[in-house]
């Protein structure tokens, strides 16, 4: 059986990157929450 995690930097960026977050209202809410919490890293 193959493992479920097959790392790919391209897919990682596209799905969880900053621009992907900014593209949707919910994503912007996530960034807002992470800024409020003081996260050093906002997105992948």
UniProtKB/Swiss-Prot annotation:
Matches recorded under InterPro entries: Ribosomal_bL34 (IPR000271), Ribosomal_bL34_CS (IPR020939)
Family: Belongs to the bacterial ribosomal protein bL34 family.
Record's compositionally biased regions (Basic residues): 30-44
One GO biological process term: translation
GO CC list: ribonucleoprotein complex; ribosome
UniProt KW keywords: Ribonucleoprotein, Ribosomal protein
Pfam family, one: Ribosomal_L34
Organism the protein comes from: Rickettsia akari (strain Hartford)
GO MF annotation list: structural constituent of ribosome
Record-given protein name: Large ribosomal subunit protein bL34
Gene: rpmH
Stretches the record annotates as Disordered: 16-44
């Amino acid at each position: 059986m193959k493992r479920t995690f097959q790392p790919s930097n391209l897919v990682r960026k596209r799905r969880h990157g900053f621009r992907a977050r900014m593209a949707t209202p919910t994503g912007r809410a996530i960034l807002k929450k992470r800024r409020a919490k003081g996260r050093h890293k906002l997105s992948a």
